[in-house]
Regions:
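Hydrophobic alpha-helical membrane-insertion signals
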Residues: 1-29
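A short, ordered amphipathic alpha-helix with a cationic face
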Residues: 5-8, 53-55, 97
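A general alpha-helix detector
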Residues: 17, 43, 60-66, 106, ...
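Amphipathic alpha-helical interaction elements
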Residues: 19, 23, 32, 36, ...
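Basic, short loop/linker segments at the boundary and entry of helix-turn-helix/winged-helix-like folds
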Residues: 24-66, 71
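Anion-binding and metal-coordination hotspots
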Residues: 72-85, 95-497
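Short arginine-rich
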Residues: 90-94
Length: 497
């Protein structure tokens, strides 16, 4: 076969509409078909003035963000350039060929002047999720929770080391009440609440001393609201952490953004509150990983009438020493028995919520198992037990061994882990170009809203296509059934000849 060389010409005149040129199975048609985009107008109506020159349609602005995230473009400047030459994007936005595409800075100025201090992003996220629920795509009987980090727009080598106050945990007051109740039962004095800060002055320098717990953290010079993230073998960097919950079908139900140095077990409570405020009555099971197995989290979930499903957590003890589960707790006598059958009696309940059980030094001094039990110089073994330990034991020793656990927990890898993988790979969750916690919270809501919308649109499109195919099949079958009946009628009729 001879080689052919074509001299391309770009002066062809095409007499077609944009509607005809956009393929029927293109993603933008799925997105446009699954939801009525006019729902945005009531959400932003109070952010616009009743007088003045006409603005750019807010639906067009938000659709540009959806194009930016769903198709993984990332940059708004690049998104505007893509819209100029992409007929499918123009069709989705409702912009004709001779109409000018909005400038990339238009969205930035609208965010600064209108949308930044509003709740429109959360409302859009909720509206898309409600639409998915109305289609029957969301199953909230079991929810899956986890967090992932997103690298911040900050140099990891430019930071200052600062001393900051340790923030009070959300359950600290309830924990203190439980500690004092336990101490009073054992004849101990209750721990006082630090409701008012006492002013103490140093006798030598005369400076004010504050009775506040502090810690040293690294604060970025570029983005001070991000946090230094360092976990296992992952690269040490400044990042933001996204705590989310999704259903078994992968639809994101709630999302909260925090600094990257906040532990998952701390950010859990804010995201769990957002989830429960909306869907508490529908949730029966909460599935989490090993990082969330704390007495406070177990207590919170179980007291809400929900079951917590979590994996086995390896004991964090020194190599060569007895594990904590090898010390048997006697609930009746409120004591522990060591592997040598010696009693560890209750001593006190500390301010962290742990009851301390101590052995008799005389029993430990000549014990043949002391080398595997304790290395203390005073020959005394101390075992601690949290005041809410029974909730953790219910999760780890009872629920974890049920048949439901074997069905629910393995689905984590195909639900919430899939959400993180898709959003990082296709929807700009791996890095952020924005600086500041509020901006990244808004961005994360839009990313997960786009993820829900894309998932809903494809499921909706498949269901419509399947319905159409079934209708065609039933029509064809009915046609042949009628033909068959007619043939049978003719063949069974007696001849008059």
């Amino acid at each position: 076969m001879a080689m052919t060389k074509r001299n391309g010409k770009n002066d062809t005149i095409i007499l077609n509409t944009i509607e005809e040129l956009v393929p029927q199975d293109h993603d933008v048609r799925m997105l446009d078909n699954c939801i009525d985009w006019s729902f945005i107008y009531p959400l932003v109506e109070n952010l616009y003035s009743d007088v003045g020159r006409p603005s750019i349609d807010p639906v067009v602005l938000f659709k540009m963000i959806f194009i930016n995230i769903i198709f993984g473009i990332g940059s708004m400047r690049k998104t505007c350039r893509e819209i100029q030459v992409n007929l499918a994007y123009r069709w989705f936005l409702g912009i004709s060929m001779d109409e000018r595409v909005p400038n990339y800075s238009t969205w930035s100025q609208n965010y600064i002047r209108r949308y930044g201090d509003s709740e429109v992003f959360e409302e859009i996220f909720d509206q898309i999720l409600k639409q998915a629920i109305s289609y029957g795509f969301v199953d909230m009987e079991t929810v899956y929770g986890d967090s992932t980090h997103q690298k911040a727009n900050a140099n990891k080598n430019k930071y200052t080391d600062e001393e900051v106050e340790i923030m009070k945990k959300i359950y600290e007051n309830d924990l203190l009440d439980e500690i004092n109740r336990d101490r009073e039962e054992h004849g101990k004095k209750p721990i006082k609440k630090n409701e008012k800060e006492e002013l103490n002055f140093d006798e030598e320098t005369g400076k004010l001393k504050r009775d506040i717990q502090t810690k040293h953290i690294k604060i970025s010079k570029t983005d001070s609201e991000s946090g230094c993230f360092h976990k296992g073998e992952k690269e040490k960097c400044f990042a933001y952490s996204h705590q989310i919950f999704c259903d078994r079908n992968g639809f994101v139900l709630a999302s909260v953004c925090v600094a990257g140095n906040v532990h998952d077990s701390v950010s859990f409570f804010s995201a769990y509150k957002v989830l429960n405020d909306k869907y508490m009555d529908q949730i029966k099971n909460v599935c989490l990983d090993a990082g969330y197995i704390t007495p406070a989290i177990c207590k919170t979930i179980l007291e809400n009438g929900q079951k917590m499903y979590a994996p086995y957590k390896r004991p964090m003890t020194k190599k060569g020493y007895y594990k904590k589960y090898e010390y048997v707790y006697d609930e009746g006598y409120d004591c522990y028995l060591c592997p040598n059958n010696k009693v560890l009696s209750y001593s006190t309940t500390n301010k962290l919520g742990y009851k301390e059980y101590k052995s008799n030094p005389k029993d430990c001094e000549n014990c043949p198992l002391r080398g595997r039990c304790t290395s203390s110089k005073n020959f005394q073994k101390v075992v601690t037990r949290h005041v809410w330990e029974e909730y953790r034991e219910e999760v780890m020793d009872e629920i974890r061994h049920t048949p439901e656990w074997k069905e629910i927990y393995p689905r984590r890898k195909e639900s919430i882990e899939r959400v993180f993988a898709d959003c990082k790979e296709h929807h700009t969750l791996r890095y952020t170009r924005l600086r500041g916690l509020q901006k990244n919270q808004h961005q994360s809501l839009m990313i997960f809203a786009c993820y829900n919308l894309k998932r809903m649109s494809r499921w909706r499109w498949k269901s419509i296509s399947k319905t159409a195919q079934n209708l065609i099949k039933s029509t064809i079958l009915n046609y042949f059934k009628k033909k068959e009946k007619r043939y049978l009628f003719i063949s069974t009729t007696l001849s008059t000849i």
